[in-house]
């Protein structure tokens, strides 16, 4: 992928500190939307979707911001992905997100996702916040998670 530092095989290392237990406000933050086929919520050819987006981003002389990729599991068979970019990308489905978002970082095997979502929902309620839309950010592919020794997943929700 052209936007990745050549020393990094695939996914850049992830620093959880800026994302753990944080509220951020976005005003017209640009994203590019793509889709990934899933089988019972498990993505199939996720990397192909990222490569499609990267090709369009590179062609537009743009950048993927923080490798932020919000995943919206719309059904057992589909996941919409929103990749943060630094400008509008021609020939892409551009989407602007605005609002307050709460993020919490989790680490471990993907089969813990259900537990993480329950924990996250509890934390949000304890803080007196209300979720409008929940996204998952899988910060590295399984191969890179193994290489780095950590599998960070960030749950990010748009708040009411």
Name what the model sees in each region.
Residues 1-160:
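A solvent-exposed interaction/effector surface
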């Amino acid at each position: 992928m052209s936007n990745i530092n050549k020393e990094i095989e695939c996914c850049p290392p992830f620093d959880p500190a800026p994302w753990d237990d944080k509220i951020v406000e976005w005003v017209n933050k640009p994203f590019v939307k793509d889709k990934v086929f899933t089988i019972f919520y498990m993505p199939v050819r996720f990397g192909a979707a990222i490569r499609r987006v990267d090709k369009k981003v590179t062609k537009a002389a743009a950048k993927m911001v923080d490798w932020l990729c919000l995943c919206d599991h719309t059904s057992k068979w589909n996941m919409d992905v929103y990749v943060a970019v630094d400008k509008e990308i021609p020939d892409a489905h551009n989407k602007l997100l605005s609002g307050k978002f709460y993020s919490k970082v989790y680490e471990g095997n993907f089969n813990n996702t259900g537990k993480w979502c329950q924990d996250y929902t509890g934390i949000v309620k304890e803080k007196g916040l209300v979720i409008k839309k929940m996204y998952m950010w899988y910060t590295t592919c399984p191969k890179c998670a193994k290489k780095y020794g950590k599998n960070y997943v960030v749950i990010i929700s748009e708040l009411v």
